[in-house]
Amino acid sequence: LEMKGLPVNVVQTVGHTQIRRLVLGNVERRPSPAELEQMKQLAREAMQAGAIGVSSALIYPPAVYAQPREISALAGVAGEYGGGYFTHMRNEGDRLLEAVEEALQIGRDAKTPVHIFHLKAAGKANWGKMPRAIELIKNARASGQRVTADIYPYINNGLGIAALIHPRHFTAGHAALVQKLADPKLRNQIREEMESTGGWENWYRHAGSDWNRIVIGKSNHPKYRKWNGLSLAKIADENGEDPWDTFFELVIGGAFALPETMSEANKIMALQQGF
């Protein structure tokens, strides 16, 4: 940024994920009191250096393993400096409403403003939850809580394609999982989870379990690079591959995916809100 410059102003949050990884690594556990103090000190240093708040991305490992108390503690540090809590919530589909409630409660506990990134209801089964999610935010604002949100102006969301895999496979980190993905048994296990299990942010199911509705924005893989912008189903067809084999190769390459999970009506409804 300093070398190239930008035509707009830029501000920076300090990521909860980065802080957690520095202190705990990628493990699935709670920090000890001493470790939590170390995490708070890192947040404090970032705020003193000019950060505008603490941000979280709670669908991705290792942040997905964090409990609300841990996040509130870091957001509270941001509040001490007049900063806010900015969150990519824990769930945007089956447990959307619980995730909104969690974000609002973290803000109350930390005594800091809340900003929700990419407010959405992902998956057709969850589209009806958007009015209630908006109502929760409006009620919080009416009570005096400072809450805002931003919204995608389109119906595809964006994420690293590895996020389609259950978070439990990432406890040793992304690189460790990639090294194991050549194992057909592991691939079959992951496929079965994606096709049949709930209780987690299952983006494959949010996209209707349809590879035609998952566009690859950037493959980061020399074999597939010329098909950036096409659906995974189309890329697999062009290569004469089973879509699941293409999927796992794209995970190994670190592809960025654009699943079609949202409704046009919800998009318009969200954009019309005053927050």
Give the residues covered by each predicted segment.
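N-terminal, positively charged nucleic-acid-binding surface of large information/translation enzymes
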Residues: 1-5
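Divalent metal-binding pocket/active-site signature
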Residues: 45, 51-103
